[in-house]
Amino acid sequence: MRVVVAGGGTAGHIEPALAVAEALRDKHGATVSALGTARGLETTLVPDRGFELHLIEPVPVPRKPNMDLLKLPFRVAKALGQARKALKDTDAQAVIGFGGYVSAPAYMAAKSLGLPFFVHEANARAGMANKLGVKLGGVGLNAVAGSGMDGDVVGIPIRAVLSGARDESAADRARDTWGLDKDRQTIFVTGGSQGSVSINKAVEQAVDQLVEAGFQVLHAVGKKNELPAAKPGYHPVPFIDDMQAAYTVADLIVCRSGAMTVAEVTAAGVPAIYVPLPHGNGEQALNAQAVIKAGAARQIDDADFTAQTLIDATLDILLHPSTHQSMSDAAKTSTAGNASTVIADMIAATINSQHN
C-alpha cells in the first residue's frame, strides 16, 4: 500500500499529515511519502519522522490582484508537473492533502492520474486549496461542521503519543531538559514556530509577577526572535520540536488557536488560554470555540492580550485547583485524538477496494 500525503509550510499543515502517515504505516503497513516545499518546516519534520520527502514549488494564491497573480498559471503548471512526477516515482495508490501551498498541485496531479484523493480541512473555515480539491472530486473530510467545504466531520488527526494519560517519567525527563522545578506549576507559552510579537511582549512584562506567584514559565519565543535572558523561574527557548514533552510538563498553555494546536492541547488534557491570530480568514477565532464552550479553555483576543489580562486569567485558573481540574477534565473527555485512525482506515479501505 503506497500513499502520498501533502501538507507543508506550517506545523498546522504538516502535523496532521504526519499523524495520518504514522497511522497508515503503523496500522496498515503502508509506505508513505510526503510532498512539501523547500521553505517549510517539513524539510526537517518529515525526515525526522522517517518519511521520504519530495519537494515541489509552492503555489501561494495572492489575496489581492498584483503582479504575482500573473505568474500564478506558470507556477501552477510547474508545481503540477513536479507533483505528477512524485506520484509516479512513488507509484502512489492514493493521495491525501491538508491544505497549504502544496495541496492544490497534489490534488490536480492525483486527478490527472486517476488516483483517489482525500482532502482534510482542519480549520473552522476552509481554505481555497481544499475547496478546489473537493470540487475536483476529492473526498472531503472536515475537522468541524460548517467549514464551507463538503465532506464528513472526522476531527483533526493527531499523533497517538499525544493523547492519553500523562507519562510522569517523560515529564521528569522534560523537566531535566529545560531545567524546570518539579514543585512549581508550569506555564508553557508558545506563539508557534515563528513566535508572536504580542504574546512575547505580554509574557516579558508579566513574567516577574507570575514567578512571584509561585509559577515557572517555559517560553518558546520563535526561531527568528531574539532570545531573552533566562532567570529563576523563566526558561526561554527559541523553539520546541518535541511538543509531546512540553505538554507533559505543562499545567497551563498560552498559545495561538491554530486548529492543530487546539486539537493537540485538548487531547493532551491541558487547560489553555488561546490568543487567536487576528489575520487570514479569521479561522483562528473559530477553531477553539467548541473546547471553550466545553469549559476546557479560555480565549483572549489579540487586541486585548496584555500582561495584566494574562496574569488575571492565569491566576484565576492556577490558583483555584477546582477550576484547573474541571478544565483538564473537560479536555480529556473530548473526542480529540482518534481522527488519525479513522482517516487511515478510510484510505486503506479505498485502496483495498480498488485491488480486490
Curated annotation (Swiss-Prot):
Predominant location: membrane
Enzyme Commission designation: 2.4.1.227
Keyword flag tRNA-binding: no
Places the protein is found: Cell membrane
Coiled coil regions in record: none
CDD domains tied to this protein: GT28_MurG (cd03785)
Molecular function per GO: UDP-N-acetyl-D-glucosamine:N-acetylmuramoyl-L-alanyl-D-glutamyl-meso-2,6-diaminopimelyl-D-alanyl-D-alanine-diphosphoundecaprenol 4-beta-N-acetylglucosaminlytransferase activity; undecaprenyldiphospho-muramoylpentapeptide beta-N-acetylglucosaminyltransferase activity
Pathway: Cell wall biogenesis; peptidoglycan biosynthesis
Enzyme class: transferase
UniProt protein name: UDP-N-acetylglucosamine--N-acetylmuramyl-(pentapeptide) pyrophosphoryl-undecaprenol N-acetylglucosamine transferase
Naturally occurring in which organism (per UniProt): Corynebacterium glutamicum (strain ATCC 13032 / DSM 20300 / JCM 1318 / BCRC 11384 / CCUG 27702 / LMG 3730 / NBRC 12168 / NCIMB 10025 / NRRL B-2784 / 534)
Gene: murG
